[in-house]
Amino acid sequence: MAKNASIQWNNSLRLALSDVDETIADVYTPAEPAMIDELASFLDEGHKLFLVTGGSIQRVQNDITNFLPPELRQNILISHCSGAEVWGFMPQGELQPSPFYSVYEENFTDHTKQAWRKIVDQLINEFGLRPHSTQQKIDFWATVGRDPLDIMLDDRGPQITLEVVNGIDLTAEQLKTLPYPVPLTHGKHDLRVAIMDRANELFSANNIPVTPRLGGVFALDLAIQGVSKTTSIKRVLADNQVLATIGLAQGDIKNPQELEVWGDKFSIIHGGTDRHISEAVSPKVRSIDFREENPSEFPKGFNIVIWDGRHRLHHGLLEYLQSRH
């Protein structure tokens, strides 16, 4: 057991449902070698992993699964873009030729896809945003700077994300430079909220089934309406054919102790989307929060515990994984 941690390893665990950003790896950053080693041994021991992320399938591959031995990848499922699609792997380690389901391809015409992106362009112009490619935030600050109007834009197909790296807590001086108001929300002037409110108006007026919502630390996710981490997980856990691709059946994970949720943002007040993973399974399933959050902000009735080892975020999960040895 990890020193100073009161949370012990779950010896009954069969399937872990895990967030990605800041839980397995830092944002837009490959998982560290030690994490890859632990995930590989976790899978080699017969455990299964369901990665649930607002990020794209390409990012999960580039930052995590491509580093894992090919023969172990078939034990992994990936719900990306906040539940818009669920993918798996072939026995040889290649990605399946098509997702197990795709709300995006099933419901969006080419015209709707184009109209969605025109609205994104309109938002960028109205708010005077300067979009840049995605990168580690340290690199972004070094090469681009800290102006709140400089953002990262990530078109993931089934989801478009604006990373408002410098604008989640605007100062009085920064607010004076903007030609539009930014509302005070939970004690902060968060530029994402102003953009989100306008995006809601535009999507509604144009009948585009997209919902803007806060995600991650500084992300504004423009996600398909009605789709969430919860819906994708529930769909998979109810489908024996999908579960069979990772060597499981519904009967294998009936006991709440056979499942576990790993995440880092469960706070309702601060837009924590990892709570949606917990909401997809029995409230008795243990959810481990690897960020220091206020438990009073968690959804009521769920078994959410805060990791109390030496480290937090992805280093906290690494510590937890290492504690089983």
Question: What kind of feature is each model-predicted range?
Answer:
Residues M1-V20, A34-S41, T65-E71:
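Non-catalytic pre-domain segments flanking phosphatase-related domains
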Residues A5-L15, A31-E32, A223, T230-H325:
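Mg2+-dependent phosphoryl-transfer enzymes with acidic/Ser/Thr/Gly-rich catalytic loops
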Residues A16-D21, H80-A84, F89-Q92, D154-G157, ...:
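Short loop/turn segments at strand-loop or loop-helix junctions that form parts
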Residues P30-I151:
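Active-site phosphate-binding/coordination module
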Residues I36-L43, R117, N200, D274-S278, ...:
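Short amphipathic alpha-helical segments and helix-helix/interface helices
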Residues V60-I64, F89, V164, H270-S278:
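A short acidic (Asp/Glu
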Residues Q135-L259, D264-K265:
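Conserved acidic, metal-coordinating active-site core of Asp-based
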